[in-house]
Amino acid sequence: MLCIRRSLSRFVDSCPRPRYDTGCTYCEIPKFPADKQIDFDRNLNGTQPETWKHLLILSHGYPSMEAMPPRIELTPATLSSEINAVKRQMLSPMHPVAVSNVVVNNHTLPNKPLGPQEHFVYLYPDRKSIRFEAKDLATFIARYLVPEEKPEVYNPFKQEVEKTQRIQQSSIEFEEQDITDELVLICGHGSRDVRCGVMGPLLQREFDQVLTQENMSSHVKTGQITHVGGHAYAGNVVYFPRKGESVWYGRVFPEDVQGIVDTTIKQGVIIRDKYRGYVNGA
């Protein structure tokens, strides 16, 4: 199992206080039901799911996160359900792949409109946007979501079969582009859990306000993401920088947004008491 750990030298202990009020920086957070309270007790370090790659689906067909079903991976005819059906056979348990559906503001669109049987995804840490036809899903998985196997004991028959498969796969062209924007995604999957349904829109609005104020909105995009684990730590924020691994934060509130922008997005420094990843020595 892959485990990405970060050096303590790249951390600050806590989130800096905001420097100004956008109008909702100090907005009161609505009260949650008794059985849906935010967990303020657990140390967030190590609560991030370990992933080798993170696939973000943009072509899910839902206009907003509010319209997203609670378990889209079980919804027929969605890319999530198609991957879910074959993941045990095709994906490596030692190289886990997270699959999420996202609604992103002002993201880079394909050069031409998607057809009814086409998919459009972002893939990290590859930082690629990829467009492909539904019929080529198996090849897409083999090419992008499975690690290259190490050489095995010589077997002429097996090598010939694998050679044929490689030729077949290599003949399929995927429309692929580099992702140049940075991306901030907030879990807003309200049909799955009310905490994220409340916190997601609040946080996205605050990020949009702060990024505009800081003249960063042209290259840092925001959006909402389906369940990423840890609803009890809402608001959950995942930041995908231009370089390096993604940064996962929990228990983020509107008053924390300026600190995240100033500290993590501008300086590349991680806020330890919000960080859901793994820390050396922690």
UniProtKB/Swiss-Prot annotation:
Source organism of the structure: Meyerozyma guilliermondii (strain ATCC 6260 / CBS 566 / DSM 6381 / JCM 1539 / NBRC 10279 / NRRL Y-324) (Yeast)
Name the record gives this protein: Altered inheritance of mitochondria protein 32
Domain of life of the organism encoding this protein: Eukaryota
Family (UniProt): Belongs to the AIM32 family.
Gene3D superfamilies documented for this protein: Glutaredoxin
Entries under PANTHER family matching the protein: ACTIN PATCHES DISTAL PROTEIN 1, ALTERED INHERITANCE OF MITOCHONDRIA PROTEIN 32
